[in-house]
Amino acid sequence: MKIQEKMRKPMLEARYLNVENTDRYRPIIRLFYLKYEKLKYWMYQEDVFEELKEDPYFQEYTMEQCQQDLAALASWGNLLTIQDTRKVTTIEEFKNKKFRYQLSETAVEVERMVIRIENLLIEGSSLEPTLLERLRISLGRPVSYTHLTLPTN
């Protein structure tokens, strides 16, 4: 087997999966992925921030943290950026560089792989460690039984 140059280099796009702030990076990438699936490719920092703030885990999350997280993900190649100059009316606004962000194609494929791994079914007879976590999450969701009808015997 001939080992190509790119196989010996680290894959920076997968870095967000196993670093200090992965608890913030993974939801951001998942948000972009879900929007990507709905054909909404570009997002502003404010959109990302507001979506994350809807989750109780992100109640203490700040706009500065969001900006730093997006910058880190962009530096690893997960997000593509473009400066948005459509709404700029002053030189000061132009200098503040408001960006739009898009998930890179590599990040799309990494996130698809992550989702497949998260949804793996039990193949063997042993209890999968993530099964308990998935059960806990599923049991935490409210269940509606209004659509069920009882048998009349």
Q: What residue spans do the PLM features occupy?
A:
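Short alpha-helical segments that sit at the start of domains
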Residues: 3-39
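Short acidic, hydrophobic short linear motifs in intrinsically disordered regions
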Residues: 39-52
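Short helix-coil junctions and helix-kink-helix linkers
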Residues: 50-61
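Short amphipathic alpha-helical interaction segments
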Residues: 60-75
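A short, conserved structural fragment
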Residues: 74-85
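Short, Lys/Arg-rich nucleic-acid/phosphate-binding segment
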Residues: 84-96
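Leucine-rich, amphipathic alpha-helical/linker segments
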Residues: 107-145
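Conserved small/polar residues in nucleotide/adenosyl-binding loops
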Residues: 146-153
